[in-house]
Amino acid sequence: MIRHTAVDVPPGTCYGQTDVPLKDSFEQEAEAVVERLQPGRFDAVYSSPLSRCVRLARFCGYDEARLDARLMELNFGRWEMQRWENLSGPQLLAWYEQWIDTPTEGGESFMDQYRRVTAFLDELRRLPYRQVAVFTHGGVIACARIYTGEITFEQVFTTMLPYGSVKKIVV
């Protein structure tokens, strides 16, 4: 699983399924991803449909990556593109206390995201592929790591992989 490169969003901004731009350092970061993927011979290549993932997949030579909405980041609903420090209200407090099961305002819960990611992984397991590349997001990779038992739900925020990471997941 490959996490997209750094996004051009002000620090402290809540974003998930918003199609945000990448930083000017994209090519340099993407070259490092290409090096980590070599000699990448994949039976199939998938990508989140968000441009930050599609652009990286194409840069890495996978113009025909299969787009799958289940690989999108968490939907933060009305919180998208708001500064975390400006968010308030009972829904935010409930989310902070029970972020696994509480949906964001107008969005989804982490458990909602986990279910769609595990549905993708369950489907992938039934296919005859041995090696698959998946261009996606930090939250999706965290869900996959929970699915395989590498981390727990409680470790999601303390073990988030950096932008441009390549993480081998065995399902």
Language-model-detected regions and their locations in the chain:
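Phosphate-handling substructures
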Residues: 60-115
